[in-house]
C-alpha cells in the first residue's frame, strides 16, 4: 500500500519541500460547486509535477438533473484536456452529498452513469468515491454502476472519534476496518491527518500500488538549456527551439502554477526567472 492525500483550496500554504517526502499519490479537487477551477488547482498540479508525485482529480457531485451533470463534467474536462491530460488518468466522482440521497436510487444511478460515461468517452478512467454509510444505504444501484468498472475509493474513519491528529507516518487501521467495497483500491481512512509541511488537517488515503501503473514514470520535463538568448521569455524560448507564442506561454504558465496568465510583464519575468533557474516545467 502507498499513502497519499486529497487536497483542495482548504489546505493552504503547503511547504512542498517537506510534504512531498511522505506523499506518494495525490488527488486534487478539480472544480468547485460553480464548476470553476479550485483556486489552488494549478499550483497543486504544478507542485505535484515538479516533485514527481502522481496525481489524479476528484469532482464533488452536486447535480440533481442531467443538465447540471453535463455542466459538472464539462467543467472538469475543460480544465484537464488542454494541459493536464497527460498527467491525470482518473477522474473520481465524489458521491456523498445529502441532496443526492433524496433523488431515489434510479435517478441517482442514471446521473452517476451519465457522468461516468462522459469521463470515459473523454479518455479518462472513471473513479468512484463514496463513504461506507452512503454505500450501505443503497442510495444508487451498485450493480449498474459497477458495470462501468470504476476505480473505487472509499471513506471510513474508524479512529477519528478517538483522536485529534493522525500523522501520516503511523500505520493505517487494521484491515478488518477497511470498507473493502467491490473494485476498491483506495481507502480514505482519516480526515484528521497530519503531514509535515501542511498546516491544516488533511484527509489521508491508502492505495494499492497498482494506481501508480496508470501514471507515466516521467511526470515532468524541464527546460534545461545551458545557453539561451533574449531578455524576454518569448525570445528566450525561441532561441532554444521552442514556440514563444502567447498560446504556448499560456500552457507553460498553467503547468507552472502561474495563475490567470495574461502575458503581463510580471508573469513573463517570473517565467523567465524559472527558465534561468532551470526549473521551468514543460507543458
Where are the language model's segments positioned?
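Functionally critical loop-and-helix segments that line ligand-binding/catalytic clefts
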Residues: 1-9, 16, 142-219
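Surface-exposed patches in mature extracellular/periplasmic domains of secreted proteins
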Residues: 58-61, 86-91, 127-131, 248-249, ...
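Catalytic domains of cell-wall/extracellular-matrix polysaccharide-remodeling enzymes
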Residues: 87-168, 173
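Extracytoplasmic/periplasm-facing segments of secreted or lipoprotein envelope proteins
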Residues: 220-243
Amino acid at each position: 500500500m502507498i499513502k497519499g492525500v486529497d487536497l483542495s483550496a482548504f489546505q493552504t500554504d503547503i511547504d512542498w519541500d517537506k510534504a512531498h517526502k511522505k506523499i506518494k499519490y495525490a488527488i486534487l479537487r478539480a472544480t468547485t460547486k460553480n464548476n470553476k477551477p479550485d483556486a489552488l488547482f494549478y499550483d497543486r498540479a504544478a507542485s505535484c509535477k515538479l516533485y514527481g508525485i502522481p496525481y489524479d482529480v476528484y469532482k464533488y457531485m452536486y447535480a440533481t438533473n442531467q443538465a447540471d451533470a453535463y455542466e459538472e463534467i464539462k467543467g472538469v474536462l475543460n480544465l484537464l484536456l488542454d494541459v493536464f491530460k497527460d498527467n491525470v488518468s482518473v477522474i473520481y466522482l465524489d458521491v456523498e452529498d445529502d441532496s443526492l440521497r433524496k433523488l431515489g436510487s434510479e435517478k441517482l444511478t442514471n446521473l452517476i452513469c451519465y457522468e461516468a460515461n462522459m469521463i470515459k468517452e473523454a479518455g479518462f478512467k472513471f473513479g468512484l468515491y463514496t463513504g461506507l454509510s452512503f454505500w450501505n444505504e443503497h442510495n444508487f444501484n451498485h450493480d449498474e454502476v459497477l458495470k462501468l468498472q470504476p476505480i473505487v475509493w472509499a471513506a471510513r474513519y474508524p479512529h477519528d472519534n478517538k483522536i485529534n491528529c493522525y500523522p501520516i507516518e503511523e500505520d493505517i487501521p487494521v484491515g478488518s476496518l477497511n470498507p473493502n467495497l467491490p473494485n476498491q483500491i483506495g481507502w480514505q481512512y482519516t480526515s484528521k491527518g497530519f503531514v509535515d509541511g501542511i498546516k491544516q488537517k488533511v484527509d489521508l488515503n491508502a492505495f494499492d500500488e497498482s494506481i501508480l501503473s496508470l501514471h507515466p514514470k516521467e511526470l515532468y520535463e524541464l527546460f534545461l538549456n545551458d545557453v539561451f538568448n533574449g531578455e524576454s521569455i518569448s525570445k528566450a524560448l525561441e532561441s532554444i527551439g521552442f514556440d514563444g507564442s502567447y498560446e504556448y506561454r499560456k500552457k507553460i504558465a498553467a503547468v507552472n502554477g502561474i495563475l490567470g496568465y495574461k502575458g503581463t510583464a510580471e508573469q513573463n519575468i517570473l517565467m523567465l526567472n524559472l527558465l534561468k533557474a532551470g526549473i521551468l516545467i514543460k507543458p
